[in-house]
Amino acid sequence: MSQEKKVFKTEWANRSLTIETGQLAKQANGAVLVRYGDTVVLSTAVASKEPRDGDFFPLMVNYEEKMYAAGKIPGGFKKREGRPSDEATLTARLIDRPIRPLFPKGYKYDVQIMNTVLSADPDCSPEMAAMIGSSMALSVSDIPFQGPIAGVKVGYIDGEYVINPTVAQKEVSRLDLEVAGHKDAVNMVEAGASEITESEMLEAIFFGHSEIQRLVNFQQEIVDHIQPKKKAFVPVEKDEVLVEKVKQLTQENGLKDAVLTFDKQQRDINLDALKEKVAAEFIDEEDADNEVLIKEVNSILNDLVKEEVRRLIAEEKIRPDGRKTDEIRPLESEVGVLPRAHGSGLFTRGQTQALSVLTLGSMSEYQILDGLGEEEQKRFMHHYNFPNYSVGETGPVRSPGRREIGHGALGERALSHIIPDLKDFPYTVRIVSEVLESNGSSSQASICGSTLALMDAGVPIKAPVAGIAMGLVTRDDSYTILTDIQGMEDALGDMDFKVAGTAEGITAIQMDIKIDGLTKEIIKEALDQAREGRLAILDHMLQTIDTSRSELSAFAPKVVTMTIKPEKIRDVIGPGGKKINEIIDETGVKLDIEQDGTIFIGAVDKDAIARARSIIEDITREAEVGQVYEGKVKRIEKYGAFVELFPGKDALVHISQIANERIDKVEDVLKVGDIFKIKVTEIDKQGRVNASHKALL
C-alpha cells in the first residue's frame, strides 16, 4: 500500500465525500479514511499469508461503533464498548454481502475487513461510508478483488426518490432501502417499506444504482491513480482425467435419481451413499497420498452434485423435490398452539416449520436503543432462533449469531409497518420465532408464523403479511427463477431473494447473490413472481384465521391510557417516587407516564386497573369554585379546619365559615375524622382552596 498521504474528493447527496489513503494503518494490506460530511470511518483490509483448508471463503467483515464518535460515554460498570450491538452486526452483514461475490473463485485466504466509526453525523450514514471504505480498502490493497462496489440508501417521499435521506426525511419516507452493486449491476438489496408496489421498488433500486455507478467511477479513478500491485492468484485446477472418471462413476450410480428425491433427509442419505460408493473406488490404504486424493474426489463429487441440480433446473425445469419452478411447497398453519401464551402461530411450508410466540407487555418493557444516534425506544421486537435440531444436527448451544440476528431483524422490518400505532394499541409487543424444522426459507416462515401469532393475540394489525424466498439458476445466457426455494436450491443456486408484504405491497426485501450482479429484467421478474407466491400464501393463512381476535388473551396484560395535565405529573409521582410506588404496591399495576401527561396503566386484572385509575383521578382532580364536597376533617388549627375534598387536595374552612353563629373554638363544633359538607368559595393564585359550611346553611 502507498505510504504517501493522498486525498480524493467528490460530492455525494449534496454533502462532501473525501477518501484519504497512505497516512493511517499502514501495516494493513489496505486502509482508507472516509469522510462523509462529519462522519469519519477508518476501513482496513488484511489477508492471511496462507490459504485455509475447506471449500468456504473465510471472509470476516466487522463494523465497530465507538461511542466517542457521537460524544457519548458507554454505559455499564466498565464504561467501555462491549460486544457489537445488533445494529452493528446487521451493518457488518450488509457490507459483507455485496463484497463476497467479487473475490476470485477458489480464493481461500482469510480476509478481515475492519470498519471503525470515529465520528458520526446522523445525517451522513456511517453504514454507507463504511461500505465505500471497505470497497476502497480492498481496491487499494494487494488483495485480489473484482471491485470496486458502492452502496446507497434510498428514500421515497411524496412520490420522489431521495439518495441518503436525512433523519428528518426518514421519518416521512415510505421506503428505507439499502442497495449496493458495481458498475454493471446490482448485487445486494435490503429494504423495509410501507406497502411499496413492485414497480416502485424496482425503480427505487435502479435509481440507487445510477448513483452507485457514479461512486464506483470515483473509486476507480482513485485506483487508477494509486495503481496498487495485486498478488497473483491462480486457482487450483482439478485433474480433468480424475474429474471425468468421477463423473462417469456418479452417472453409473444414479446421480440424477439421488438428487430427485422429495424428502430432504432421504436425499441426503442417497447422496451420501453415492459419494461413499464412488470414493471407495479410489481408496488405496497402502498409498500415502490417498487421503489427499479422496479429498479431491469428494470436492469433485460436490461440484458434480451442484452441476446436476443446476442442469436439471435449467434444462429440464425439474427441481430436486419434483416441483415446478413457480410452485410452492405444501402449506399448513395453526393458531392458538400454546394455551398460556398471549398469541401463537405455527406455520409449515414443506419441511420448514416455524413456531412464533407473541408476548404483550406494558410500555415500560420497550427496548432502549442507545447507539451513535439519539436514544430510541422500540416497542416491537421480533427474535429468531435456529436450534441445531431443526436440521437434525448436534452442536453447542450459543447466544444468537449473525445469521439469527439478521433473520430476526428482517422479520421485524417486514412486520413493523402493520403494528398499530401507540395511541391505538398501547403495548410493547415481542415475538419469538422458533425454527423447529428447516429446509430453506425459514426466515420467511417466521414472518408468516408471526402474522398468525399477531392475529391470534388480538393485535389489530393493519393487514396480514406473508414472506417468500425466490431463487435463481443461470446457465450460459439463460436463467430460471424459482419460487419458494428449499435448502439445496439456496446452497447451490445463484440467488436468495426474500420478499415479504401484504396483499397491497412490499414491506421488506433482502437479496443476496453469488454471481456478479443482476439485471433489471431478472429483478423485475423475481419481484412479480414473488407477488404471485405471496398472495397464494396469504390466501392460505386467511383460511386459518381471517382477522385478529376481538379480545386479548385472558393471560395478557390489559393496558388503558388516561391523560392528565403535565403539571400534575409530579403529584402522581410524589416526592422521590413515593406516591407512584404507593399506587403500584396497592394495586399491583404497572404505570408508565409520558411527559405530555399520558399515563399507561397495565395489569392482567381489570379491577386493579380501575382502582389505580380512580386513585390517579383523585390525585389529579381539581377543585371547582361553587362545587359542594363532602370530606373528612384532616386537621384542626386555631383559625379553622382543613377538610379533605379528595385524596391529595384539602380545603381550609375558616372558623368564621363553620357555623352561622360565632364560635370561639373550632373544637367546639368539629373534631378530626368528622365528615363535613362544604362549598368551595375561592381558589387563590397558589392553588390554595378556601371553603365554607356556613354558605350551605
UniProtKB/Swiss-Prot annotation:
Superkingdom as given in the UniProt entry: Bacteria
GO biological process assignments: mRNA catabolic process; RNA processing
Sequence ranges assigned to domain S1 motif in this UniProt record: 626-694
Pfam families to which the protein is assigned, alphabetical: KH_1, PNPase, RNase_PH, RNase_PH_C, S1
Cofactor(s) recorded in Swiss-Prot or TrEMBL: Mg(2+)
PROSITE patterns the UniProt entry points to: KH_TYPE_1, S1
Reported function: Involved in mRNA degradation. Catalyzes the phosphorolysis of single-stranded polyribonucleotides processively in the 3'- to 5'-direction.
Name of protein: Polyribonucleotide nucleotidyltransferase
Originating species: Staphylococcus saprophyticus subsp. saprophyticus (strain ATCC 15305 / DSM 20229 / NCIMB 8711 / NCTC 7292 / S-41)
